Amino acid sequence: MVSVTTKILILGSTGSIGTQALEVIADNPDLFTLVGIAAGGSNPGLVIEQARAFNLRPHQVAVAGKQAAGEVGEALGGTVIDGPDAAQTLVESVQATDPADAVLNALVGSMGLGATLATLRSGAHLALANKESLVAGGEFVMAQARPGQIIPVDSEHSAMAQCLRSGTEGEVARIVLTASGGPFRGWTREQMWEVTPEQAAAHPTWSMGQMNTLNSATLINKGLELIEATLLFDTDADLIDVTVHPQSIIHSMITFRDGCTIAQASPPSMKLPIALAMNWPHRVPGAQPALDFTQAHTWTFEPVDDAAFPAVQLARDVAKQKGTFPAVYNAANEEAAAAFLAGRIRFPQIVDVVSEILQGASQFAGVSSDVDDILATESEARARANQLIDRLAR
């Protein structure tokens, strides 16, 4: 009997999620076959190494940076796809010739929107780690997807999807979204004025890329996840509780109408949700070590300090507004986060910028009928955010 593997296309192959996904594929050749990779171009040597390890041809590789693409192409003996839309172009090319069964979108930021939409149009399952593309695209993106086509990779949303298997849609009472609290849990806003980019890059329980780590420190990441949960599970923002769980063992919970709460627990590793998303709805044996319940464990939960970390409440308000308002939240944060990393503004000012841009967002945000509406809203939000950052940086 011939074994049929799931063909996987990975976008963002050199990042934290992408490299772990490749490890899962390499460890499970009986389950997965890699049919292409895309990367930004900051690490062309790693792209070359990945392509060679999986015997990829140049046409199966995309690199956004032109110079890096040239280096990769020369090493692989051909021309690779390049340019700012390289990932989207790769999706369209692969899906037209040797279609992937699932596309893992692990790109960073809303630049992943085009690739998300291209994947949905192709009919492939979308294993989504690029939460920003869903937040920015909102209801427009969800309208392009058939039921069950988007499989979350975020550990929290993967946990929700797993817990939801325990009941029916009408039985769900509340969703509980857990947060580690980040490196500054327990700090006051005043204390955080002196935070450096190096401090913000040190997450207590997770190993992630720079932007995700910073977003976790401000709790913007948890705000994005709250918005994402309302879209993925078609639920109201007020039915989602956010609780701080520093141990990062419980990845999220579902409370049902009979008073039962189902939780998903596992050590803090992304390999389990990555493997599950690529092989959904089936689990991958040995994806990661399980918890050892013969040892003592202490799990704690506490409320979010909204005074010190207002990003979650901002996101809740944005989720209720819907339309392109979530795109404003994300775009303003991307600009403010970059400004902080460049030393132009202080740590608490990241969320201050997001909040102020949202206050005037009704002038340019609203219902999105197409991608152009989303991109126009993002562009205006970025412009306004940078104007504000310029004033703050003086």
From Swiss-Prot:
NADPH binds at residues 14-17, 40, 43, 130, 132, 209. One of its GO terms (biological process) is isopentenyl diphosphate biosynthetic process, methylerythritol 4-phosphate pathway involved in terpenoid biosynthetic process. It catalyses: 2-C-methyl-D-erythritol 4-phosphate + NADP(+) = 1-deoxy-D-xylulose 5-phosphate + NADPH + H(+). The keyword Transport does not apply. Mn(2+) binds at residues 154, 156, 225. It holds the Pfam family DXPR_C. Its cofactor is Mg(2+); Mn(2+). Coiled coil: none annotated. It comes from the Bacteria. One of its GO terms (molecular function) is 1-deoxy-D-xylulose-5-phosphate reductoisomerase activity. Keywords: Isoprene biosynthesis, Manganese, Metal-binding, NADP, Oxidoreductase. Its EC number is 1.1.1.267. 1-deoxy-D-xylulose 5-phosphate binds at residues 131, 155-156, 180, 203, 216, 221-222, 225. It is an enzyme of class 1 (oxidoreductase). Pathway: Isoprenoid biosynthesis; isopentenyl diphosphate biosynthesis via DXP pathway; isopentenyl diphosphate from 1-deoxy-D-xylulose 5-phosphate: step 1/6. Catalyzes the NADPH-dependent rearrangement and reduction of 1-deoxy-D-xylulose-5-phosphate (DXP) to 2-C-methyl-D-erythritol 4-phosphate (MEP). Belongs to the DXR family. This is 1-deoxy-D-xylulose 5-phosphate reductoisomerase.
